Amino acid sequence: MLLTGSRGAGKTTLIDALTQGCDLPGVRSYARREKPDGPPDCIFLENRRTGERRVIGRFLGGRMEPEAGVLDTFGVQALRDAMEGKNRWAVVDEIGFLENSSPAYCRALEELFRKKRMLAALRKADSPLLCRLRSREDCLVIDLDVLEDRQEHTGAGFPPEKGNL
C-alpha cells in the first residue's frame, strides 16, 4: 500500500495509526528544523528496528543536498535489515527525491518491495524511482489529496467519524 499526497496531507499520521502496536521493520525519514516555520536544516533516515539514524540531506545554499554516501551504506543496510526480518510487512516513510542520489539505495528499496508487503509514504512528485513504485501492479496507491477533495465535495469524512461507518 502506497500513500501519497501533498505535504501535511496525513501520510505519516495514517502510517502511524495503521502500525500502532506493531513492531515493523523498515526506515523512517524526517526533517529537523531550527525554526518551527523555517525550512529543514537536515533530513534524517532512521532504522525502525534499531532506532539508529543518520543525516541523508543537508540544507545548503538554499536547497536540500543529498548525502548519497550515507544512503549507500547506512540506508542500504537498514533496508537489508528489513528484508531479513521475519515480518511479512515493512514500512518506509517517506520516499522522496533524496533517494535518487543513490542507485544502490534505489535497488535495495525495489528489492524490499519484491520481498515484503509494503506500507510506504511517497512524496507527491515525479522522479524515476517514484514513478516506478507508483506503477507497480502489486501496489495499491492511495492519494490522500483525492480523498480530501472527495470529502469537500461529498461531506464524507476521512477517516469516517465514529458512528458514521
Where are the predicted features?
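Phosphate-binding/switch loop-helix module in NTP-utilizing enzymes
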Residues: 60-110
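Conserved lysine of the Walker
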Residues: 11
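Hydrophobic anchor at the beta1->P-loop junction of P-loop NTPases
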Residues: 3
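The conserved Walker
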Residues: 7
